[in-house]
């Protein structure tokens, strides 16, 4: 098989590093209106405030959790069996789907009968694929437009709120100053949301199931949940919700095995990946994808043209609509939740890329551009777009309309080719919505900071507020090896301006296929960017975690500082490099300033002085300055004293 020949289905096992709970964290479930709506969250426990700081209780903080059952010690994890079919009952009870007697795609049947791949295949699936009954539409958008609040929508509303109201209520009972503490910890700076309706002075204080339904019906948000991926935990992508992060994984012709890609998926979701795209281009794409989907609690996206190209031995000009259609059905019946489809690469735009510094950098875009030139006609993706919609709504696969002409350098940013394609994607969005097919739009790419908002504004206008999903953008081209940072800058900005999901970039971008460590670095960097965007927009409750960590920092609760952070392991590692002893975990200083120059310790000294003198903090500062002034004059009023 791939470069690593060791993977066999019988020996498959979970990555042990991905199943241990994070420090001082436990998985909790919030039940909805019915017992089978159990929404997972991560509860981070905190130590009490030391008596010297007031001695109050610090209740647990709840955070969004994408890790699925993997971080639940009560769950039995066996990747050979896959995850439980969480949504199966919801799908079946709607009565608009049917279980097929077998696979519909020619390629799927061919692979199932191939004895050469039998030892690689996932053997744990004991159900056949489902499809909409003839004449039915099973998309979440279709239900939303009919006024139906699905269990998925209720699940999402609970998940987005992160038990914020319960946390603030628990603060009120934490001690005699509970009401004051709740007001302080719940305080949040007003955001600038650039027109996003959920935020601002008249915005929401919490997300409701009805609001979720309205946003999906409007096309401003999508719920990527294929009916053949019932293992997935419902989530939402839209500018009026928490900014999400996607992680790209996948093998290539020269590296990685099925086992490694499953490990990358479990590692990505441990650190906060909201969706995962399998971009495999090497051998056994079908089998790799099956293992990933069956073991993924988050939506899985793909670029179907990659696999279609493999079926014609890499010759783009030999691609046909029939081959591509069969590939869509094959992947839809496996359970892929969203497809990147480069239907906006039109023949008329291809010559516009000749003036670029870096030409066409999208793999999918270059494949379709080559096909258009070879046949001198519009691509079969564009010509058959409504046929594709018919497939999508039969399985509830969402469109991720690909930016095949995205700029690959800041030199090419916002050029005619890029913006022409974006306008076409807006036109295709209207066609998809006519079929009630959920749709998001992919965006750049490499864009300098001053041009980022123009990208967002044009997308909102031309694509009628369909969710934007961007790769970065990278804000400079001078830092190979650090493109998670060059792109994280742009990601935070465009997330603030309205992008709904950010596609991570790892340190290996432009250099090689990322390993597990690179995946973690990319995810953490992009969770940081997404959270910064949520804060800037004024997402209700976004600042709760910041406030909790800042309070822990001021009270020298080191363990709580580590555990409330995005990467507790890294924070603890850095601290322990210079102060490894357990006693340092309760010290009132760190190695940066030492015991005598810690600004927070000095502030505490001022407060203690104020309490002793019976004055306010401001009065204490003034009084302390007067004492020092007298002392200074007595020593001769010299700035530098001889010792």
Curated annotation (Swiss-Prot):
GO terms for cellular component: cytosol. Gene3D superfamilies: 6.10.250.620, Radical SAM ThiC family, central domain. Binds 1 [4Fe-4S] cluster per subunit. The cluster is coordinated with 3 cysteines and an exchangeable S-adenosyl-L-methionine. [4Fe-4S] cluster binds at residues 590, 593, 598. Pfam families: ThiC-associated (PF13667), ThiC_Rad_SAM (PF01964). Its cofactor is [4Fe-4S] cluster. Keywords: 4Fe-4S, Iron, Iron-sulfur, Lyase, Metal-binding, S-adenosyl-L-methionine, Thiamine biosynthesis, Zinc. GO terms for biological process: thiamine biosynthetic process; thiamine diphosphate biosynthetic process. Its EC number is 4.1.99.17. Substrate binds at residues 248, 277, 306, 342, 362-364, 403-406, 442, 469. It comes from the Bacteria. One of its GO terms (molecular function) is zinc ion binding. Pathway: Cofactor biosynthesis; thiamine diphosphate biosynthesis. It catalyses: 5-amino-1-(5-phospho-beta-D-ribosyl)imidazole + S-adenosyl-L-methionine = 4-amino-2-methyl-5-(phosphooxymethyl)pyrimidine + CO + 5'-deoxyadenosine + formate + L-methionine + 3 H(+). Zn(2+) binds at residues 446, 510. The keyword Coiled coil does not apply. PANTHER family: PHOSPHOMETHYLPYRIMIDINE SYNTHASE, CHLOROPLASTIC, THIAMINE BIOSYNTHESIS PROTEIN THIC. Belongs to the ThiC family. This is Phosphomethylpyrimidine synthase. It comes from Paraburkholderia xenovorans (strain LB400). The gene is thiC.
């Amino acid at each position: 098989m791939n470069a690593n020949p060791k993977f066999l289905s019988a020996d498959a096992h979970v990555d042990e590093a991905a199943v241990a709970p994070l420090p001082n964290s436990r998985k909790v479930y919030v039940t909805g209106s019915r017992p089978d709506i159990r929404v997972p969250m991560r509860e981070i426990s905190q130590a009490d405030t030391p008596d010297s700081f007031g001695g109050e209780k610090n209740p647990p903080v709840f955070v969004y959790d994408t890790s699925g059952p993997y971080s639940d010690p009560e769950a039995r994890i066996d990747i050979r069996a896959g995850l439980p079919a969480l949504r199966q009952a919801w799908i079946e009870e709607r009565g608009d789907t049917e279980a097929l007697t077998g696979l519909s795609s020619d390629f799927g049947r061919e692979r199932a009968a191939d004895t050469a791949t039998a030892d690689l295949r996932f053997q744990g699936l004991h159900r056949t694929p489902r499809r909409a009954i003839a004449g039915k539409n099973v998309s979440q958008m279709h239900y939303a437009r009919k006024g139906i609040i699905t269990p998925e929508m209720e699940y999402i509303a609970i998940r987005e709120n992160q038990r914020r109201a319960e946390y603030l209520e628990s603060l009120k009972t934490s001690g005699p100053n509970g009401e004051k503490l709740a007001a302080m910890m719940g305080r949040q700076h007003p955001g600038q949301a650039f027109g996003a309706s959920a935020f601002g002075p008249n915005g929401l204080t919490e997300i409701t199931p009805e609001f979720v339904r309205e946003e999906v019906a409007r096309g401003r948000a999508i719920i990527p949940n294929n009916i053949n991926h019932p293992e997935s935990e419902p989530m939402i992508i839209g500018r009026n919700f928490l900014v999400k992060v996607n992680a790209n994984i996948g093998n290539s012709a020269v590296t990685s095995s099925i086992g490694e890609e499953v490990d990358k998926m479990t590692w990505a979701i441990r650190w906060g990946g909201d969706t995962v795209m399998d971009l495999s281009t090497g051998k056994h794409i079908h089998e790799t994808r099956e293992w990933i989907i069956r073991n993924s609690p988050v939506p899985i996206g793909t670029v179907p043209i990659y696999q279609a190209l493999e079926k014609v031995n890499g010759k783009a000009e030999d691609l046909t609509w029939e081959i591509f259609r069969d590939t869509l059905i094959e992947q839809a019946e496996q359970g892929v939740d969203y497809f990147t489809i480069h239907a906006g690469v039109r023949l008329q735009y291809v010559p516009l890329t000749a003036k670029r510094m870096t030409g066409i950098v999208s793999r999918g875009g270059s494949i379709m551009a080559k096909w258009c030139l070879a046949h001198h006609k519009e691509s079969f993706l564009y010509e058959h777009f409504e046929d594709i919609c018919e497939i999508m709504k039969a399985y509830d696969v969402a469109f991720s309309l690909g930016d095949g002409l995205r700029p690959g350098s800041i030199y090419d940013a916002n050029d005619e080719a890029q913006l022409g394609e974006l306008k076409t994607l807006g036109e295709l969005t209207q066609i998809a919505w006519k079929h009630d097919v959920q749709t998001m739009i992919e965006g750049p790419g490499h864009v300098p900071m001053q041009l980022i908002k123009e990208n967002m504004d044009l997308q909102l206008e031309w694509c009628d507020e369909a969710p934007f999903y961007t790769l970065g953008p990278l804000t400079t081209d001078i830092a190979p090896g650090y493109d998670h940072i060059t792109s994280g800058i742009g990601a935070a900005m465009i997330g603030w301006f309205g992008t709904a999901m950010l596609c991570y970039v790892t340190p290996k971008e432009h250099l090689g296929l990322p390993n597990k460590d690179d995946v973690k670095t990319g995810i953490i960097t992009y969770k940081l960017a997404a959270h910064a965007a949520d804060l800037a927009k004024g997402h209700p409750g976004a600042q709760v975690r910041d406030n909790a960590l800042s309070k822990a920092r001021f009270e020298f609760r080191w363990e709580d500082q580590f555990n409330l952070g995005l990467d507790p392991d890294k924070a603890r590692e850095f601290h322990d490099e210079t102060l490894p002893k357990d006693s340092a975990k309760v010290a009132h200083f760190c190695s940066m300033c030492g015991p005598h120059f810690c600004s927070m310790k000095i502030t505490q000294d001022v407060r203690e002085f104020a309490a002793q003198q019976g004055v306010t903090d401001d009065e204490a500062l003034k009084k302390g300055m007067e004492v020092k002034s007298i002392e200074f004059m007595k020593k001769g009023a010299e700035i530098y004293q001889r010792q």
